[in-house]
């Protein structure tokens, strides 16, 4: 770290990491990503950015999800970031946000965070998801955000959390929509196989869905616990095979389990620790966590960072 981070030689990365670090030496949560997201990396951003090579000018992310790392790299480091996801409704949200954040903000501002409104929006979103209707992209983005960010968990087509009926909390959250300014981020709908084949000469950041078998994760959650169609059957072996053949550096966030450790044993494996934002503010604890003896409601990470240098 430079002695004076604010001289001409200080990189954007150095300055960002310096500002993100708390007095106790640990990184603070990165708070500019607008979505609450299961498995989100808002507290891991500093740890991950540390390992991004200094010469990188573009980052490819096949699993944008909540986008904390991707948004930080685009907003704070000024890097070009190409984000992808297989979930078209999530991709539409980002595309609308990037195209016209003010229209999205205004539409969300017109909604009251009540259970009645939530149920109406949920049914409208569900009808689109089941192909019973086709929502305009702006309305779809509005409905997705309102349903997802105000839900317990959070979860797509989930149930409204009591703590998000607080109107001031809702208005504060919308400030992230209004203030979003990340022109070097682009988001498209595509599978990880297509993305890895399309960008063989780029640096990748990947946060794939967790391995369920023999891991601490009991059930898939994408896009929602009751129908984890993107989670169940995810091709972990295919991803490992393709990454072993990828000739450029990458950083991979994965859950800690036997399969992952064996599949990526030839790469650098780190064991960082952070808290998940999923369920932040909730005090209920699930049956599985009670049975294994968790003594509070704060969910700790059980992830690995896998690095190809």
For the regions a protein language model found, what residue spans apply to each?
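SAM-dependent nucleic-acid methyltransferase catalytic core
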Residues: 2-45, 54, 101-221, 234-235, ...
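SAM cofactor-binding core of SAM-dependent methyltransferases
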Residues: 50, 57-126, 166-167
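Short His-Asn-centered micro-motif
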Residues: 61-63, 84-85, 188-190, 206-208, ...
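Short, polar loop motifs at secondary-structure junctions
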Residues: 65-66, 173-174, 254-258
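Short catalytic/ligand-binding loop motif for oxyanion handling, primarily in non-cytosolic enzymes
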Residues: 68-72, 90-92, 153-156, 212-215, ...
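Short loop/helix-cap segments at secondary-structure boundaries that form the rim of catalytic
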Residues: 73-76, 180, 197-199, 259-266
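Long, positively charged, glycine-interspersed low-complexity recognition regions
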Residues: 229-309
């Amino acid at each position: 770290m430079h002695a004076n981070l604010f001289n001409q030689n200080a990189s954007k990365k150095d300055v960002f990491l310096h500002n993100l670090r708390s007095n106790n030496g640990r990184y603070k949560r990165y708070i500019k990503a607008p979505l609450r997201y299961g498995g989100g990396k808002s507290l891991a951003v500093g740890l991950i950015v540390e390992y991004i090579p200094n010469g990188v000018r573009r980052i490819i992310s096949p699993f944008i999800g909540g986008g904390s790392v991707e948004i930080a790299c685009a907003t704070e480091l000024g890097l070009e970031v190409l984000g992808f996801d297989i979930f078209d409704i999530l991709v539409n949200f980002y595309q609308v946000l990037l195209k016209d954040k003010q229209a999205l903000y205004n539409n969300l501002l017109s909604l009251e965070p009540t259970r009645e409104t939530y149920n109406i929006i949920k049914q409208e979103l569900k009808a689109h998801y089941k192909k019973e209707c086709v929502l305009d992209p702006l309305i779809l983005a509005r409905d997705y955000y309102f349903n997802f960010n105000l839900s317990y968990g959070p979860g797509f087509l989930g149930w409204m959390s009591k703590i998000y009926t607080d109107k001031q909390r809702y208005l504060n959250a919308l400030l992230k929509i209004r203030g979003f300014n990340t022109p070097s981020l682009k988001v498209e709908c595509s599978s990880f196989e297509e993305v890895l084949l399309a960008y063989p000469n780029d640096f990748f950041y990947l946060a794939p869905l967790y391995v369920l078998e023999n891991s601490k994760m009991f059930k898939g959650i994408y896009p929602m616990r009751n129908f984890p169609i993107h989670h169940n059957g995810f091709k972990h072996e295919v991803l490992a095979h393709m990454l072993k053949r990828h000739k450029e550096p990458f950083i991979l966030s994965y859950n800690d389990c036997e399969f992952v450790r064996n599949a990526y044993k030839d790469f650098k494996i780190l064991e960082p620790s952070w808290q998940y934002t999923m369920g932040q503010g909730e005090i209920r604890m699930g049956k599985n966590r009670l049975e294994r003896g968790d003594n509070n409601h704060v969910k700790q990470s059980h992830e690995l960072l896998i690095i190809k240098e």
